[in-house]
Protein backbone atom coordinates (compact mmCIF):
# COMPACT_ATOMS: atom_id res chain seq x y z
CA UNK A 1 0.00 0.00 0.00
CA UNK A 2 2.95 2.36 0.49
CA UNK A 3 3.71 2.15 -3.23
CA UNK A 4 0.10 2.91 -4.14
CA UNK A 5 0.05 5.89 -1.79
CA UNK A 6 3.35 7.13 -3.24
CA UNK A 7 2.09 6.96 -6.83
CA UNK A 8 -1.00 8.98 -5.84
CA UNK A 9 1.31 11.84 -4.80
CA UNK A 10 2.75 12.02 -8.32
CA UNK A 11 -0.41 13.25 -10.03
CA UNK A 12 0.48 16.20 -12.27
CA UNK A 13 4.24 15.79 -11.83
CA UNK A 14 6.44 16.65 -14.79
CA UNK A 15 8.64 13.81 -16.02
CA UNK A 16 6.38 11.25 -14.41
CA UNK A 17 7.94 8.18 -16.03
CA UNK A 18 11.44 9.22 -14.87
CA UNK A 19 10.21 9.88 -11.34
CA UNK A 20 8.52 6.47 -11.23
CA UNK A 21 11.60 4.71 -12.61
CA UNK A 22 13.84 6.39 -10.05
CA UNK A 23 11.52 5.84 -7.08
CA UNK A 24 10.29 2.32 -7.71
CA UNK A 25 13.35 0.68 -6.16
CA UNK A 26 12.07 1.82 -2.75
CA UNK A 27 9.20 -0.63 -3.12
CA UNK A 28 10.91 -3.72 -4.52
CA UNK A 29 9.86 -6.89 -2.72
CA UNK A 30 11.17 -10.43 -2.83
CA UNK A 31 12.50 -12.10 -5.95
CA UNK A 32 10.56 -15.36 -5.66
CA UNK A 33 12.26 -17.33 -8.42
CA UNK A 34 14.50 -19.90 -6.76
CA UNK A 35 12.84 -19.47 -3.36
CA UNK A 36 10.97 -22.31 -1.67
CA UNK A 37 7.20 -22.24 -1.23
CA UNK A 38 5.62 -24.64 1.22
CA UNK A 39 1.99 -25.44 0.41
CA UNK A 40 0.04 -26.93 3.29
CA UNK A 41 -3.12 -28.54 1.97
CA UNK A 42 -3.16 -29.87 -1.58
CA UNK A 43 -6.84 -29.74 -2.42
CA UNK A 44 -8.02 -27.90 -5.52
CA UNK A 45 -6.75 -24.47 -4.39
CA UNK A 46 -3.47 -25.75 -2.95
CA UNK A 47 -2.71 -27.69 -6.14
CA UNK A 48 -3.37 -24.60 -8.28
CA UNK A 49 -1.14 -22.45 -6.06
CA UNK A 50 1.63 -25.06 -6.10
CA UNK A 51 1.50 -25.40 -9.89
CA UNK A 52 1.50 -21.62 -10.39
CA UNK A 53 4.53 -21.28 -8.10
CA UNK A 54 6.42 -23.89 -10.15
CA UNK A 55 5.61 -21.80 -13.23
CA UNK A 56 7.13 -18.78 -11.49
CA UNK A 57 10.38 -20.66 -10.90
CA UNK A 58 9.86 -21.50 -7.24
CA UNK A 59 10.86 -24.73 -5.57
CA UNK A 60 7.65 -26.13 -4.11
CA UNK A 61 7.15 -28.46 -1.17
CA UNK A 62 3.67 -29.83 -0.56
CA UNK A 63 2.20 -31.31 2.59
CA UNK A 64 -1.19 -32.97 2.79
CA UNK A 65 -1.79 -36.18 4.73
CA UNK A 66 -5.14 -36.53 2.93
CA UNK A 67 -3.96 -35.89 -0.65
CA UNK A 68 -6.55 -37.32 -3.03
CA UNK A 69 -5.73 -39.26 -6.18
CA UNK A 70 -7.30 -36.45 -8.20
CA UNK A 71 -5.14 -33.87 -6.44
CA UNK A 72 -2.02 -35.93 -7.04
CA UNK A 73 -2.85 -36.36 -10.73
CA UNK A 74 -3.23 -32.59 -11.18
CA UNK A 75 -0.07 -31.70 -9.26
CA UNK A 76 2.98 -30.63 -11.28
CA UNK A 77 5.69 -33.30 -11.15
CA UNK A 78 8.18 -30.72 -9.85
CA UNK A 79 6.23 -30.32 -6.59
CA UNK A 80 7.99 -32.39 -3.94
CA UNK A 81 6.10 -33.99 -1.08
CA UNK A 82 7.32 -33.21 2.40
CA UNK A 83 6.49 -33.88 6.00
CA UNK A 84 5.28 -30.85 7.91
CA UNK A 85 8.42 -30.33 10.00
CA UNK A 86 10.71 -30.35 6.94
CA UNK A 87 8.40 -27.96 5.10
CA UNK A 88 8.38 -25.55 8.06
CA UNK A 89 12.16 -25.70 8.40
CA UNK A 90 12.85 -25.23 4.68
CA UNK A 91 10.23 -22.92 3.17
CA UNK A 92 10.83 -19.21 2.59
CA UNK A 93 7.09 -18.73 2.08
CA UNK A 94 4.30 -20.89 3.49
CA UNK A 95 0.74 -20.79 2.21
CA UNK A 96 -2.08 -22.60 4.00
CA UNK A 97 -5.08 -24.23 2.30
CA UNK A 98 -6.72 -26.50 4.86
CA UNK A 99 -10.19 -26.53 6.41
CA UNK A 100 -10.83 -25.55 9.99
CA UNK A 101 -11.31 -28.68 12.08
CA UNK A 102 -10.52 -29.53 15.71
CA UNK A 103 -7.17 -30.94 14.53
CA UNK A 104 -6.21 -27.81 12.55
CA UNK A 105 -7.29 -25.27 15.21
CA UNK A 106 -4.24 -23.18 16.18
CA UNK A 107 -1.99 -25.39 14.06
CA UNK A 108 0.22 -22.30 13.78
CA UNK A 109 1.28 -21.53 17.33
CA UNK A 110 4.48 -20.70 19.21
CA UNK A 111 5.79 -24.26 18.77
CA UNK A 112 5.10 -24.20 15.02
CA UNK A 113 6.74 -20.79 14.58
CA UNK A 114 9.83 -22.02 16.45
CA UNK A 115 10.23 -24.77 13.82
CA UNK A 116 9.97 -22.35 10.89
CA UNK A 117 12.86 -20.94 8.94
CA UNK A 118 13.93 -17.55 10.28
CA UNK A 119 12.44 -14.73 8.23
CA UNK A 120 9.74 -16.85 6.57
CA UNK A 121 6.49 -15.36 5.31
CA UNK A 122 3.19 -17.02 6.30
CA UNK A 123 0.12 -16.59 4.09
CA UNK A 124 -3.18 -17.77 5.59
CA UNK A 125 -6.19 -17.63 3.30
CA UNK A 126 -7.89 -20.63 4.90
CA UNK A 127 -9.43 -19.80 8.28
CA UNK A 128 -8.38 -17.36 10.96
CA UNK A 129 -8.73 -20.01 13.65
CA UNK A 130 -5.76 -21.93 12.23
CA UNK A 131 -3.39 -19.33 13.68
CA UNK A 132 -2.84 -18.36 17.31
CA UNK A 133 -2.99 -14.57 16.94
CA UNK A 134 -0.89 -13.78 20.02
CA UNK A 135 1.79 -16.20 18.85
CA UNK A 136 1.89 -14.81 15.30
CA UNK A 137 2.18 -11.24 16.60
CA UNK A 138 5.09 -12.33 18.82
CA UNK A 139 6.74 -14.18 15.91
CA UNK A 140 6.47 -11.15 13.62
CA UNK A 141 7.59 -8.65 16.26
CA UNK A 142 10.63 -10.81 17.12
CA UNK A 143 11.58 -11.17 13.45
CA UNK A 144 11.09 -14.93 13.45
CA UNK A 145 8.46 -14.33 10.77
CA UNK A 146 9.17 -11.56 8.31
CA UNK A 147 5.52 -11.10 7.50
CA UNK A 148 2.08 -12.59 8.10
CA UNK A 149 -0.62 -12.12 5.48
CA UNK A 150 -4.21 -13.11 6.15
CA UNK A 151 -7.68 -12.47 4.88
CA UNK A 152 -9.16 -12.96 8.34
CA UNK A 153 -8.58 -9.63 10.10
CA UNK A 154 -8.66 -9.71 13.89
CA UNK A 155 -8.40 -6.72 16.19
CA UNK A 156 -5.15 -8.07 17.63
CA UNK A 157 -3.57 -8.17 14.13
CA UNK A 158 -4.72 -4.88 12.61
CA UNK A 159 -2.05 -2.20 12.66
CA UNK A 160 0.83 -4.50 13.60
CA UNK A 161 3.87 -3.76 11.45
CA UNK A 162 4.50 -6.55 8.91
CA UNK A 163 1.07 -8.08 9.40
CA UNK A 164 -1.18 -7.53 6.40
CA UNK A 165 -4.92 -8.06 6.83
CA UNK A 166 -7.27 -7.94 3.87
CA UNK A 167 -10.99 -8.78 3.65
CA UNK A 168 -11.91 -12.42 3.10
CA UNK A 169 -13.31 -12.78 -0.40
CA UNK A 170 -13.75 -16.56 -0.52
CA UNK A 171 -16.20 -17.93 -3.04
Language model features by range: what are they?
Residues 55-59:
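Residues at the starts of beta-strands that form the adenosine-phosphate
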Residues 46-47:
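N-terminal Rossmann-fold NAD(P) dinucleotide-binding loop
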Residues 52-53, 116:
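Aromatic pocket-lining residues of Rossmann-like dinucleotide-binding sites
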Residues 1-36:
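Phosphate-binding beta-alpha-beta segment of Rossmann-like dinucleotide-binding domains, i.e.
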Residues 65-156:
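Rossmann-like adenosine-cofactor binding region
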